[in-house]
């Protein structure tokens, strides 16, 4: 092997190792950012993941009582209306880390009307940590929190032919592909539409089959919420839940291999706290 060939071989091997590392390094939200880079990332609208990275770093600083995090609070309020769903979702979580943040309470209340199921849910979870005008826990987002315990029905965005579907029982991330739909057009020239899950969880039911023709608004699938989502909802309902929420909570109290112990235990705690509050009322 010549020296030139050997060098090319080692260079190729080095790149095979380096490029995945660089990709991981640039997308890993745990990488610490200096203050100046956080400021730059928050304004990088061309790279939403940069904004998310900065938001996660700010959230961690708030949790560690780092007073320097307050310099970015106006940015957190601004990002509540960012066009990218993932940014708004992360932002809603971060604002819940400081209930004294100027403008946070008002921004989160507005986010309860967001077009995204997950953004509404995260805003509601954060609001449960705030106090309302009477000094009680803010229960404004309670309906959205209860909704986090319910399956989500995925609908066809338009008429067309189903060309592919995921399998029942498959775990799926938020944004994961549930089915593909070939739009019903005279020419058939439009590309297939990827129908994605609005939440992370598990596919409970596929309501159609490959090759079937569906109308706009037809149900494609039902997604059961993920364990983490349910657990967080139970924690919030422990604080603000009411007696009418118990029917949504109690299915998670049963012993089942599909329900992790931590979720079941949190459901039981929420149930107990709700009944205790109800019995204390005059």
Language-model segments: residues:
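Hydrophobic core positions within HEAT/HEAT-like alpha-solenoid repeats
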Residues: 54-55, 91-92, 109, 123-124, ...
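Short beta-strand-turn/beta-hairpin segments enriched in glycine/proline and small hydrophobics
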Residues: 146-162, 177-201, 222-223
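Short inter-helical turns and helix N-cap capping residues of alpha-solenoid HEAT/ARM repeat scaffolds
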Residues: 46-47, 83-84, 115-116, 226, ...
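Hydrophobic membrane-insertion alpha-helices, especially the h-region
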Residues: 6-26
């Amino acid at each position: 092997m010549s020296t030139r060939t050997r060098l090319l071989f080692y260079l190729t091997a080095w790149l095979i190792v380096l490029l995945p590392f660089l990709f991981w390094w640039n997308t890993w939200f745990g990488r610490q950012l200096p203050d100046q880079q956080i400021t730059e990332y928050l304004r990088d609208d061309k790279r939403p993941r940069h904004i998310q990275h900065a938001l996660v770093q700010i959230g961690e600083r708030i949790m560690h009582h780092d007073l320097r995090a307050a310099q970015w609070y106006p940015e957190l309020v601004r990002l509540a209306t960012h066009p990218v769903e993932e940014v708004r979702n992360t932002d809603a979580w971060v604002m819940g880390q400081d209930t004294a943040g100027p403008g946070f309470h008002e921004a989160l209340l507005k986010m309860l009307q967001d077009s995204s199921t997950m953004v509404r849910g995260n805003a509601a979870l954060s609001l449960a940590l705030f106090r309302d005008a009477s000094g009680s826990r803010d229960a404004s987002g309670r309906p959205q929190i209860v909704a986090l315990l319910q399956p989500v029905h995925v609908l066809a965005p338009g008429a067309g032919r189903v060309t592919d579907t995921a399998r029942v029982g498959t775990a799926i991330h938020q944004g994961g592909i549930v089915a593909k739909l070939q739009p019903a057009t005279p020419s058939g020239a439009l590309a297939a539409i990827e129908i994605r899950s609005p939440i992370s969880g598990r596919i409970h039911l596929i309501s159609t089959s490959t090759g079937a023709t569906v109308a706009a608004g037809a149900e494609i699938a039902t997604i059961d919420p993920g364990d983490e989502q349910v657990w967080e909802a139970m924690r919030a309902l422990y604080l603000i839940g009411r007696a009418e929420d118990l029917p949504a909570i109690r299915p998670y109290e049963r012993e089942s291999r599909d329900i992790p112990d931590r979720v079941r235990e949190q459901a039981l705690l929420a149930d107990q706290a709700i009944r205790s509050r109800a019995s204390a009322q005059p």
